[in-house]
Amino acid sequence: MDTRGFKICAAAVGILPVTAGCTDQAPQEHPNILFILSDDHTSQSWGIYGGILAPYAANDNIARLAAEGCVLDNAFCTNSISVPSRAAILTGQYSHLNGVYTLDDALRPEQDNIAKRLQQAGYRTALIGKWHLKKEPAGFDYYSVFHDQGTYRDPVFKTAENWMDDDKGVGGAVEKGFSTDLVTDKAIRWIKERDRTKPFSVFCHFKATHEPCDFPERFAHLYDGVKFPEPENLLEFGPAKSGRTFAGQPLETMAWRWNKAYTDPENWWTYYPELPFCGVEGDSVANRRAIYQKLVRDYLRCAAAIDDNIGRLLRTLDEEGLAENTVVIYVSDQGYFLGEHGFFDKRIMYEEPLRMPFVIRYPKEIPAGTRNGDIVTNVDFASLLADYAGAEPPQQAQGRSFRSNLAGDTPQEWPRSMYYRYWTQHEIRPAHMGIRNDRYKLIFFYGDRLGMTGSDDCVSPPSWEFYDLETDPHENRNQYGNPAYAEVIGAMKREMLELRRQYKDTDEGSARMREIMETHYAPESAKH
């Protein structure tokens, strides 16, 4: 037995999963599945991953799941942006295979996915909340999803009865209330009214904590008067100090959006809570600090509604006598910058956007209060769900089940590295690929749109970044070009090429990418 990355959380000692009494449900060979997915709910704000914001997180129910299940410490996104990440979760494939490269792409209904496989295995399936994949959901017996990415207040829900593809129009019907509450209401109702002769799988997808980070009135005064601690690199103005090779998206852009939404609401895409924002004119340091405080306050209030509604879902399982035989997963589609490097948003292969905070509970099989450090990615999720359901993974799935890892038995051949690729090209955030293992990270910013949708019509000079996460966990010093790491960098370059071949991401049809690779990707060099 290989038990690397597996440990007992001391805080969980003495805590047992809560279950209710007998019900009229039929005996089942395979467990029910409750898959809860949020948007941009980054690990820094969960409270179970440590960090400067951990003491401030409203996380009673996330902490309950952690105490009763297993926390993944190294779950990563393969393309840190909402639409591609969700497609990878469903299909078990990287973007170049499932065809969803950028925010503007759609998942084809005919594409195989885990919901279809669960149906074939005898499951009743439901999808509620944020879909964002533009075409009609396939593989679900019932769905009620937002138009596009949805709104926080009085969102439009679309069902099979009134479906319209996102690019054809809004369709659907407005439902009054706050979106996180409404999604939970619908999920609870579906669970209670389910076909009790079959196992179920419900995908409960929240919009929160996506920008504009709104919150229900019951959390409007949470954190009043609180001054949040700052990340050590909040005051990183530009790349000179760290040696990073791109501009990034600074917090000042968020303040500009707040001002635009307040002064010209009719022509801005969304609203934000608690405007106007009054910055500090003429003092860039004080201004950035003020922006950070508002962003984190809004964000944590928004996140509090997620935790609150996770509690409602867990209580429903208890009341229905389902807790013991239901796999409960809570995960975010990717992480998010909360002022680290002076940034907000995601996309970049830095730790904050790359990490997918993930907790899972299955009392029959997963030891309570454990943590697992194995490298897992979102392309593995579909295979895990298929494994629990006794189903086949989606066709051409590239991931593998980590069920045995969760029980403390990691296969000897389990991957030690993960491969990442962000396809959208922007001047401030160039397209890039990279590799990460348990200590090092290597990123190649190739800086070309390669015909991808949603990209700027620009080219960025190709560049490299390398980080030693053991000595520099916050990625404050780009060590590419440091002779002390030349051997490691060369080995990781070669391994990244091998992973590209393994995952069939070889850009064989792109003469432009071949030119970039031949000119700027020299596996034997750490200086190119």
Over which residues does each language-model region extend?
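N-terminal secretory signal peptides that target proteins for export/translocation
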Residues: 1-4
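C-terminal alpha-helical interaction module
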Residues: 513-514
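Formylglycine-dependent sulfatase
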Residues: 6-8, 15-464, 473-494, 501, ...
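Extracellular, beta-strand-rich glycan-interacting domains
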Residues: 469-471
